């Protein structure tokens, strides 16, 4: 549904009422007649190549085939021969032919004017039946198999309308064999049209049974009842015997609550999931061609609509059958209702309707409505979302381990093409060149000043990266472009989860936001470091990859220790103990300086002075017991644990804490602290939203300052990726060295 009354048009896919379908499909002619219902299964007359009256190509319903011409080949205001004017009284001043009833208008109306088929019996929409779990089964509270048997007339629902008097005293669902004996008794009383009245009151099947149950639903009462039941089940979660049943029931209630809440918010009635009027697409969207010698080439929709119309007409004729025993009439009507349901299923979604109908001439199944709009070649992705647009590019993605989470590597050749208008404006504005022609010549020569100005432009202009298919909002994100000399786009590996991308040849598209509103939206809402959590369940969508985790493991690994490390060595009087066994540092800077000067390795253990906070230290072991107590002559004491020591004064106050750690763990802890510090500063002192100024550079600078604190989030993962690469290089060097030693060819 496209709402064109408002300022901004929008496309909304939702359930609609039968009244709305009638409003879309019916047309009021100038003489006051209402048209729109398709009753004839035929399409065109092969003898005259003209549409059949009241058929799926009728000119009265969908408009004329030729502009300003009716079905009689008569133009508005002219005689059939084109010489004399026809009397206005015969053709109507409003432009309606009295002979064929076709309006004189533009033939393009056949592209958007719809029709409808009035179904003789309600038909359930297949999208809400064959889905697991079924929406209808969730609302009604029955199993999926029972709902399917009701829809396809294998079961009967007793007393569908409880507010009317009934003859039979059945309850619930009944099979065909259970009601056969009662049918024989009611033979003299019920037949023909009386069966319809009997069906509405006593036994219902097919779409009628589903519609009756959905009409009686009160969504708000159902929502409250489901919520109260869910609250009661929360109190019984400790019962082990029924734990699995309780969990299943809780999950079912949660789905029912969500679905009922969505229906209430969208103002949708549940009975709209059962179709009474079937919309017919405009003829131009399902064309038909006659190629001579009665060879017809037509859209699959026409065959499917024809089958629906034929079976609907058969069901209408079945209601008019008079006489005969009740059970034979009932069986015949039940069969016709099932055939109509299957025909509508094949039209809407042949993939879910079981065995799809095939075109025996071309030996392939017919394309249903779902097949046309779904998938990569469907209407949305191929025609609406798959269009080529200006200011866009495309290239292969490769990993960028040196990038921040909000950055992407943009090839220089792509950037200079995308930002060429901005380059020309800046070159002229800064006085480098005098006109556009000189600026283009300068850009073609690729002189250094061009790259310098391009760097300045990229600093305040994000780009959008998109990978098809765009299934959710993480499929297109904004990044700060960084110029690279390669021809591939560099991407941080942590954001690949949202794109569902990997580095095995995947391609991504680059789009350039042009307007000030689009750039603002990219900065505030679409940057990758501001989209870290999944909106569906709150779990992180941006997570460290396996390479990063392995690098962090290598970074924080401690060198294996044994007693030989602390053994006295009398043969070396200058170094009786290993130098790294008793190394002690007081702050981070001392550790980093010693590591840079190669005085200590990454994995060797050392003692590090820790901050005294409440005299405690968190460990992985609760209430850890000291290994040893040491008391000094001045009254101070020292408690020695497995991985740390605590020195206390005579009063019991904690003086110092030393922990046993490594340089790698200190580096990792420092990165984590910086990341948390950036988040805490951002939350404690939130900046106000920048005022919309005329100078966009000032506004973008304020937005950059407000977003810069979050850019430290990816540093720990980046550090892990760095050490993973370093370790992989060392392993590769060792393996190559061993290979050279064993292979005479490489030697």
UniProtKB/Swiss-Prot annotation:
UniProt: Zn(2+) binding residues: 70, 72, 97, 100
Reactions catalysed according to its record: RNA(n) + a ribonucleoside 5'-triphosphate = RNA(n+1) + diphosphate
EC number assigned by the record: 2.7.7.6
Keywords from the named record: Chloroplast, DNA-directed RNA polymerase, Magnesium, Metal-binding, Nucleotidyltransferase, Plastid, Transcription, Transferase, Zinc
Predominant localisation class: plastid
Compartment list: Plastid, Chloroplast
Single GO molecular function: DNA binding
Any coiled-coil regions, as ranges: none
InterPro entries hit by this protein: DNA-dir_RpoC_beta_prime, RNA_pol_asu, RNA_pol_N, RNA_pol_Rpb1_1, RNA_pol_Rpb1_3, RNA_pol_Rpb1_3_sf, RNA_pol_Rpb1_clamp_domain, RNApol_RpoC1
Cofactor binding summary note: Binds 1 Mg(2+) ion per subunit.
Binding residues for Mg(2+): 502, 504, 506
UniProt xrefs under Pfam families: RNA_pol_Rpb1_1 (PF04997), RNA_pol_Rpb1_2 (PF00623), RNA_pol_Rpb1_3 (PF04983)
A biological process from GO: DNA-templated transcription
Enzyme's top EC category: transferase
Required co-factors: Mg(2+); Zn(2+)
GO cellular component entries: chloroplast; DNA-directed RNA polymerase complex; mitochondrion
Recorded family membership: Belongs to the RNA polymerase beta' chain family. RpoC1 subfamily.
Primary role: DNA-dependent RNA polymerase catalyzes the transcription of DNA into RNA using the four ribonucleoside triphosphates as substrates.
Assembly notes: In plastids the minimal PEP RNA polymerase catalytic core is composed of four subunits: alpha, beta, beta', and beta''. When a (nuclear-encoded) sigma factor is associated with the core the holoenzyme is formed, which can initiate transcription.
Record protein name field: DNA-directed RNA polymerase subunit beta'
Originating species: Gnetum parvifolium
């Amino acid at each position: 549904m496209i709402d064109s009354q408002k300022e901004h048009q929008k496309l909304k896919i939702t359930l609609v009422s039968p009244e709305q379908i009638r409003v879309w499909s019916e047309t009021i002619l100038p003489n006051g007649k209402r048209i729109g219902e398709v009753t004839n299964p035929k399409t065109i007359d092969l003898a005259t190549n003209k549409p059949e009256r009241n058929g799926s190509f009728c000119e009265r319903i969908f408009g004329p085939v030729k502009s300003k011409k009716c079905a009689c080949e008569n133009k508005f205001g002219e005689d059939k021969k084109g010489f004399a004017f026809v009397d206005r009284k015969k053709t109507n001043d409003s432009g309606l032919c009295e002979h064929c009833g076709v309006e004189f208008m533009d033939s393009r109306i056949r592209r958007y004017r719809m029709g409808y088929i009035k179904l003789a019996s309600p038909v359930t929409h297949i999208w809400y039946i064959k889905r697991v779990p079924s929406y209808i089964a969730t609302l009604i509270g029955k199993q999926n198999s029972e709902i399917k048997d009701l829809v396809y007339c294998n079961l009967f629902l007793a007393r569908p309308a409880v507010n009317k008097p009934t003859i039979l005293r059945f309850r619930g669902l009944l099979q065909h064999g259970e009601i056969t004996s009662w049918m024989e008794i009611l033979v003299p009383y019920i037949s023909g049209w009386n069966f319809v009245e009997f069906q509405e009151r006593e036994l219902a099947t097919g779409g009628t049974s589903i519609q009756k149950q959905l009409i009686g639903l009160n969504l708000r009462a159902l929502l409250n009842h489901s919520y109260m039941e869910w609250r009661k089940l929360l109190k019984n979660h400790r019962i082990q015997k029924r734990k699995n049943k309780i969990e299943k029931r809780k999950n079912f209630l949660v789905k029912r609550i969500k679905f009922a809440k969505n229906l209430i918010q969208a103002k949708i009635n549940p009975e709209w999931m059962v179709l009474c009027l079937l919309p017919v697409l405009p003829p131009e969207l399902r064309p038909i061609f006659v190629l001579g010698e009665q060879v017809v080439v037509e859209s699959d929709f026409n065959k499917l609509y024809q089958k629906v119309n034929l079976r609907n007409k058969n069901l209408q004729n079945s209601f008019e059958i008079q006489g005969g025993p009740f059970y034979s009439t009932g069986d015949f009507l039940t069969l016709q209702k099932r055939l109509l349901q299957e025909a509508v299923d094949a039209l809407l979604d042949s993939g879910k309707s079981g065995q799809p109908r095939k075109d025996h001439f071309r030996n392939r199944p017919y394309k249903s409505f779902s097949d046309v709009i779904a998938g990569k070649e469907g209407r949305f992705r191929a025609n609406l979302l798959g269009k080529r647009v200006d200011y866009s590019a495309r290239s292969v993605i490769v990993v960028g381990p040196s990038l921040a989470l909000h950055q992407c590597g943009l090839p220089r050749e792509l950037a200079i093409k995308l930002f060429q208008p901005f380059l020309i404006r800046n070159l002229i504005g800064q006085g480098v060149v005098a006109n556009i022609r000189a600026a283009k010549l300068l850009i073609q020569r690729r002189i250094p000043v061009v790259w310098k100005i391009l760097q300045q432009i990229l600093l305040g202009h994000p780009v959008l990266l998109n990978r098809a298919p765009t299934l959710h909002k993480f499929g297109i994100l904004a990044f700060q472009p960084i110029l690279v000399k390669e021809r591939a786009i560099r991407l941080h590996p942590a954001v690949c989860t949202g794109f569902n991308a990997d580095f095995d040849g995947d391609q991504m598209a680059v789009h350039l936001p042009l307007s000030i509103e689009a750039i603002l939206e990219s900065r505030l809402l679409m940057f990758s470091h501001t989209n870290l959590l999944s909106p569906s369940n709150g779990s992180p969508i941006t997570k460290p990859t396996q390479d990063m985790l392995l690098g962090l493991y290598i970074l924080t690994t401690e060198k294996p220790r044994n007693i030989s490390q602390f053994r006295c060595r009398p043969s070396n009087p200058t170094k009786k103990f290993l130098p790294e066994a008793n190394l002690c540092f007081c702050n981070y800077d001392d550790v980093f300086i010693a590591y840079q000067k190669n005085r200590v390795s990454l994995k060797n253990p050392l003692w590090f002075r820790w901050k005294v906070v409440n005299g405690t230290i968190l460990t992985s072991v609760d209430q850890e017991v000291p290994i040893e107590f040491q008391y000094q002559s001045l009254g101070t004491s020292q408690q020695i644990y497995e991985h740390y020591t605590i020195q206390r004064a005579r009063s019991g106050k904690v003086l110092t804490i030393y922990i046993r750690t490594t340089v790698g763990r200190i580096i990792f802890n420092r990165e984590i602290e910086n990341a948390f510090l950036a988040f805490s500063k951002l939350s404690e002192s939130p900046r106000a939203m920048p005022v919309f100024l005329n100078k966009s550079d000032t506004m973008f600078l304020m937005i950059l300052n407000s977003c810069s604190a979050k850019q430290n989030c990816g540093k720990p993962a980046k550090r892990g990726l760095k050490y993973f690469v370093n370790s992989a290089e060392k392993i590769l060097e060792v393996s190559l060295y061993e290979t050279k030693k064993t292979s005479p060819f490489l030697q």
